[in-house]
Amino acid sequence: HCSLDGSLDWIRDTYAHSPTDFFKLLDDQEHQRNHLVFTTTGCFSKGFNDAWIKLAMIRLARQKTKMSAQQKQSIFRWAPHLIRQTTKHKLTERVVKKLMNSDVKNWKQILIQEYLLDPDADSPIPDMLPEFKDKIDWSGLVKVLRESLPKRTSANIKHRMKKIRGEFNDACQGIYAQWLRHSKWHSPLLILDEAHHAKNDHTNLAQLFRQSSADDVSLLRGKFQRMLFLTATPFQLGHQELIRVIRSFDAIRWSSRRAPTISRDEVQSEIKQLEVALDANRRAGRQLDRLWGEIRPEMLSELSIDAWW
């Protein structure tokens, strides 16, 4: 109701269900890119579960180490189990070997030829993954591939693979976090609905925008020129929770030419002043409540209302 019919028809929008979907959108040519991208608040923080991306991580990790013929064969044999694609019968050892010996940028054509991908599908591997491969520490994944994969099957292979898959997923999640930090994408605006969910430092949402300790790195730090937080319940938050939500604005891209006119340090100083003022207000409120509770009827009986006030 705030715009004329048809006035917004030029805007392209889409929904990114996962980090992979989002990064694929960044591969689009500028004139084809969407103006608005909708995601859930858990899109970037949830476990990284894309099978083809994980397989590509195996391929890129292999480039960082020398492997024996037996170790390579173990990868060809067990990779579908690691990425939980054993039901795709076309993903055979032969196909995995073919992928492991090909540039990940050429995987789309191979997967189409092997009937594992529709011809009109996007490339399964966003360009950003191989682009930053030399800035990523692959040692955790290399260790799993070199030391943890079974050399042969056994009666308890399912139990063994479950444990190995856990190690593998942890390594992939670490690589994903590095990938997200190193990627050079930026956005002019982030609109975060239900922003009060960022009130606790150790939630996945909060850690996207702010550090809970000196050792942490917020994954979306420096990605947005402007940030707009929406919440219908700001005054239901405790004042410390409100301060923590406000501190999430620290993730703004302060180095851009459209950065705020004041510095990050100045903003942090103002937030600290607000925190001190809210602390003082809370103490004063508690003191007033205590003193008010100590008033007794006999203390007022000999005074007129005007005199009492």
Protein language model features and the residues they cover:
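Residues immediately C-terminal
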Residues: 44, 197-200, 229, 236
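Nucleic acid-processing catalytic cores of prokaryotic defense/repair systems
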Residues: 1-3, 10, 35-38, 239, ...
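Conserved P-loop NTPase motor "coupling/switch" region that bridges the ATPase
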Residues: 189, 209-309
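Conserved catalytic network of the ASCE P-loop NTPase/AAA+ motor domain
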Residues: 29-31, 182-184, 219-223
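Coupling/switch/interface segments within P-loop NTPase motor domains and analogous charged loops
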Residues: 23-179, 308-309
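SF2 helicase catalytic motif II
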Residues: 57-87, 185-217
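Internal, charge-rich low-complexity segments
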Residues: 2-8, 45-94, 250-295
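Conserved nucleic-acid-binding Ia/Ib motif block in the N-terminal RecA-like helicase ATPase lobe
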Residues: 2-29
